[in-house]
Design a protein with these regions (language model features):
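Glycine-rich, basic loop-to-helix element that forms the pyrophosphate-binding segment
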Residues: 61-78
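A conserved acidic beta->alpha catalytic loop
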Residues: 28, 36-45, 87-90
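Cell-envelope/extracellular polymer assembly enzymes that use nucleotide-activated donors
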Residues: 1-3, 31, 167
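Conserved donor NDP-sugar-binding/catalytic core segment of glycosyltransferases
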Residues: 91, 95-123
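Short, acidic, metal-binding catalytic loop of nucleotide-sugar glycosyltransferases
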Residues: 20-29
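Acidic helix N-cap motif at the loop->helix transition within catalytic regions
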Residues: 13-16, 41-49, 95
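Short aromatic/hydrophobic "clamp" motif used to bind/position activated sugar donors
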Residues: 83
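Conserved nucleotide-sugar donor-binding catalytic segment
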Residues: 126-204, 208
Length: 237
């Protein structure tokens, strides 16, 4: 079984799209756990509608310390062998989870490609995932990881507010996990939200690389990435 964890907070505008994408999967051996951070809008009312429709949906609602706190709560509640994570403004492609599970034999982690939804509209562009390596990154929305691997790594390190998923992947590589890649779009990722905070993202990425990679490699990567960021800022002016 695949346990799908969705973190929410005041997500009434986008949540139905995410939940419908789970409900409409061709792969049906799943449970979906919504971990809500005590929303003040109609998020929980929407979740309750889906719980009534299908007993595979579950939820909790209580204050949390951000998305990775919610994700940690979720995997600890999970019953499935595999765990996946979805943002409340993201969605799965219809065949996405099936494609991962069809290629999961012998794997500890399996991941695929991603569509990106542009800011403030529904324009979508395709992004092929690069092979995961130490210091690299792939969208957690398009990745399935065995729950036991998450447990052995202690889950997400919540001191990283943006890229704790990258840190978890690095820890998973270090432990020698078997990671498989497939070339099929698994999810549609919305570029709105915390993950679009570019400079903070670069700083956090450097800290994670410093934890897992040789120092000079980290410095070189940081200079290159920061240089690209500054050039983009200048060109926009």
């Amino acid at each position: 079984m695949v346990s799908i964890i969705i973190a929410t907070y005041n997500s009434e505008k986008t949540l139905k799209r995410a939940l419908d994408s789970v409900l409409n999967q061709s792969f049906q051996d799943w449970e979906c756990i919504v971990v809500d951070g005590a929303s003040k809008d109609n998020t929980i009312e929407i979740v309750k509608e889906y719980v009534k429709k299908d007993s595979r949906f579950r939820y909790i609602s209580e204050p949390d310390h951000g998305i990775y706190d919610a994700f940690n709560k979720g995997w600890k509640m999970a019953k499935g062998e595999w765990v996946m994570y979805l943002g409340s403004d993201d969605e799965y492609t219809k065949e996405g989870i099936k494609a991962l599970m069809d290629n999961s034999d012998g794997a500890d982690v399996v991941y695929g490609d991603t569509y990106f939804r542009e800011f403030n509209n529904d324009k979508i562009r395709f992004q092929q995932s690069s092979p995961v390596k130490m210091g690299g990154f792939c969208c957690h929305q398009s990745l399935a990881m065995k729950r036991e691997i998450i447990r052995k790594n202690g889950g997400f390190d919540e001191k990283y507010k943006i890229l704790a998923d990258k840190d978890l992947i690095c820890k998973t590589i270090k432990m020698g996990a078997n990671i498989k890649q497939i070339h099929l779009a698994i999810s549609i990722f919305s570029l709105d939200g915390i993950s679009s905070t570019n400079f903070q993202r670069y700083i956090e990425s450097f800290k994670i690389n410093r934890k897992h990679l040789p120092f000079m490699t980290c410095v070189f990567d940081f200079v290159c990435i920061t240089g690209k960021y500054l050039i983009k800022r200048v060109l926009k002016k």
